């Protein structure tokens, strides 16, 4: 076969989440829609959890002694952040479409059918509908999703494993989150899969 690429560095991306907050949500909040973090196995369940957290954030804060402002960290569309969605989120939908079509990546794909674009839109809508950020300001450059997760204001944050160093326990960034409290859910077109614990 033809060599399409040579692996130089392995990175993974998906949804970083604060498992300590989710565990408090499951054990201390009587209205929790899941009993355990392990119940999040598909997009339907993640949507239910994110929607519930966002809609009942004040009650959850009281029950769990938290200071959340949202379920998902802001989905900034400024040039410093939009690659998370224009590249990573869209790229996943295209990858699985090309894979299903048996695409020879060295030759290219002649047609994009958008087979998984409904799920792309569904995930994007979940990000923006369960965030405290005003949708009209997503391209303003004034949002800081990393800080929202780091200060434990958000539970979920789409990014990759390279972000882990920014949440170092040395408190250099002033964040309150502990590295040991973070985990990741990878995204698939048909659902979700936890990759780290």
Predicted regions and their residues:
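A structural signal for short loop-to-beta-strand junctions that line the ligand-binding cleft
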Residues: 1-22, 193-197
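Extracytoplasmic/periplasmic solute-binding protein
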Residues: 2-9, 13, 44-108, 154
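Aromatic-glycine-rich donor-binding/catalytic loop that engages nucleotide-sugar donors
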Residues: 20-38, 132-133
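Short helix-initiation/N-cap motifs at beta->coil->alpha
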Residues: 40-45, 136-151, 162
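Glycine-centered hinge/linker elements that transmit conformational signals in sensory
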Residues: 47-52, 96-140, 181-183, 190-191
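Short beta-strand and adjacent tight-turn residues that come in two discontinuous sequence segments
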Residues: 74, 140, 158-160
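Extracytoplasmic/periplasmic substrate-recognition and gating elements
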Residues: 171-197
């Amino acid at each position: 076969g033809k060599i399409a690429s040579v692996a130089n560095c392995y990175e993974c991306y998906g949804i970083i989440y604060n498992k300590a907050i989710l565990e408090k949500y499951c054990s201390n909040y009587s209205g929790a829609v899941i009993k355990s973090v392990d119940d999040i196995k598909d997009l339907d369940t993640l949507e239910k959890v994110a929607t519930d957290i966002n809609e009942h954030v004040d009650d959850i804060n009281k029950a769990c002694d938290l200071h959340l402002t949202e379920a998902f960290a802001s989905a900034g569309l400024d040039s410093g952040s939009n690659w998370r969605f224009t590249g990573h989120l869209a790229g996943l939908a295209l990858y699985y479409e090309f894979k299903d079509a048996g695409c020879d990546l060295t030759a290219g794909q002649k047609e994009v059918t958008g087979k998984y674009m409904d799920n792309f839109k569904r995930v994007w809508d979940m990000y923006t509908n369960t965030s405290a950020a005003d949708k009209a300001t997503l391209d303003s450059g004034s949002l800081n999703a990393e800080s929202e997760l780091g200060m434990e204001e958000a539970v979920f944050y789409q990014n990759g494993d390279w972000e882990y160093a920014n949440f170092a326990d040395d408190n250099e960034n002033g964040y309150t989150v502990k590295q040991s409290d973070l985990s990741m859910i990878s995204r698939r077109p048909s659902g979700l899969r936890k990759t780290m614990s």
